[in-house]
Amino acid sequence: MTQRLNIRRVSFLGVLVALALALHLLEAQIPSPLPWVRPGLANLMTLIALLTYGWRAGLLVMLLRVVIGALLLGGFLSPAFALSLAGGLASTLVMALMVRGAWRLWSPLAISATGAFAHGGAQVLVLTAFLLRSGDLPWLLPWVLVPSLISGIATGVLANLVLLRWQWYFRGVA
């Protein structure tokens, strides 16, 4: 029975990674009014992995999406890769702490919005550390954090819908 659950778990995580990667590649093709603003829909799969299997699964989905996505888009080890990795690590860590603490107290919307805020904040810190003068930080924060928060709320709403709609399935794989 354990082997069957492990196979189901691995295949489910594989599907989440594939979906996250597909959304990541799709988002890269969408023109944006600001270069750093993306919908962040690929983070939906990280959140579902976190809520279904815990922090290790969420971290795995995020890392595979960021690394494989960067390899496919030709940006591996570029500044954009560093920003994506820093944001992904920060958001996954914050969301994992919220989930581990007692995620029933937090809605997927709150977890996602907080993770998106951490994602944007980490990206601004990396930008400030490597590319910008520290005086640019106050100017840049609202331009990054407000779209991040909006994206996080949208992702949280979608996660809630997916979790409610597929509740019967998630019980079987968790």
What is the predicted function of each stretch?
Residues 2-49:
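Hydrophobic transmembrane alpha-helices
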Residues 2-9, 36-37, 73, 101-105, ...:
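Helix-boundary and loop/linker segments of multi-pass membrane transporters
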Residues 10-15, 44, 48, 56-63, ...:
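Hydrophobic alpha-helical transmembrane segments
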Residues 16-23, 50, 61, 65, ...:
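Alpha-helical transmembrane segments in multi-pass membrane proteins
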Residues 23-39, 64-95, 131, 136, ...:
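Interfacial aromatic-anchored transmembrane helix boundaries in multi-pass membrane proteins
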Residues 29, 52, 102-105:
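Helix-loop interface residues and adjacent transmembrane-helix termini in multi-pass membrane transporters
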Residues 41-56, 94-99:
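Generic transmembrane alpha-helix motif of multi-pass integral membrane proteins
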Residues 76-78, 82, 97, 101-174:
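Membrane-embedded alpha-helical hairpins and interfacial helices in multi-pass inner-membrane proteins
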